[in-house]
Each structure stands twice: as structure tokens, then as C-alpha cells.
Amino acid sequence: AWTAYDAALRGLKVAIIEQNDWASATSSASSKLIHGGLRYLETYDFKLVSKSLKERELLLQIAPHRVWPLQFGMPLYTYQRNHYLNRLKLKIGLMLYDWLAGKTRSKTHHRYLDAESLMTHFPYLRNNALKGSFIYSDAQTDDARLVLELIAGALDAGACCVNYCQFIQFLA
């Protein structure tokens, strides 16, 4: 849908065909997250993380009614093996994540909450052996609504958008 919208805005002839309803297949099974790829830091894929973070920021700017910040917490417990090493590893990873996002001075950079502070926000969290938690931000979307808006935009820009239709053959 996004590609159809973008291509139609550029004046190209565009047709998008969907066999079922818009956003009913892959989109409906998504996690609804617009994330920067924090887990890819473990495999040193800095280019992918940087690109994903830039795309996330772009979506937050151009579609704030459909993409919004969402905070995540990673609780740390003393019984976790190598919990001091894990804390250091997470700290370095989140600092790198913030840096790649270009948010070293932003309100959305990561932070650490000690166990007492964390329990005031999450009173039902298991607190025995809780050391604290790192909090960081990514984003969430209403993906089906976003797809529908993109289809509407593509239509307005001159694209041919058809759903409940099956593509059989391209005739030249």
C-alpha cells in the first residue's frame, strides 16, 4: 500500500490488487510494532538498526495518529545468571540504540529504574530478587488503519486499487 501510494504521488501509473480485504493477511498478523531492531545489535547489524530507527522516526512524524511511542521494560533479577554482566551489556546496547537513533538528548532515550521505583509503576511485577529495569522506547501502530489510509491516498493520487480480486495474467 505504501509503495502504491508513493508511486502514485510521483505520477506513475499504479494498480494494486488484493485477493482479500485490505490489510487482512500479513498485515493482520503483525506484532503491531514499529521497532528499531534492538535485537540486531547482538549480531552487529548496525546498518539495519540505524535504517530501522530512521524509518521509525519518520513514521512517528508523518503519521502520529497511527504510529505512537511505546515504552518497554526489561526487568533484571539477581538470580539471573551473570546479572551484573547482563546489566552492563544491556546498558551498552541501549546507549548504542539511542546513539543510532540520534536521540542522545531526547526524552525518549533509555533509562534505568531501580526496584523500588519500578514497583511504584508496576506493583504486580514479581519483586523478589528484582534489581531494577531498563526502560526504552519503540513505537506501535494500528497497521490496518494505516494501510487503509495509504490505499485511500493512493486512490486520491490516481492509483487503481482493487480488493477481493485475483490477478490471473498480465496482458501487454
Located regions from the model:
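Helical element adjacent to the flavin cofactor pocket in flavoenzyme catalytic cores
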Residues: 134-172
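Dinucleotide-binding Rossmann-like beta1-alpha1 core, especially the glycine-rich loop
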Residues: 32-121
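Short amphipathic alpha-helical face segments that pack within enzyme cores
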Residues: 2, 6, 35-36, 145, ...
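Glycine-rich FAD pyrophosphate-binding loop
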Residues: 8-30
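Conserved Rossmann-fold dehydrogenase catalytic segment
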Residues: 84, 128-136
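Flexible hinge/switch segments at interdomain interfaces of large molecular machines
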Residues: 122-128
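Gly/Ala-rich phosphate-binding loop of Rossmann-like dinucleotide-binding domains
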Residues: 4, 8-9, 153-155
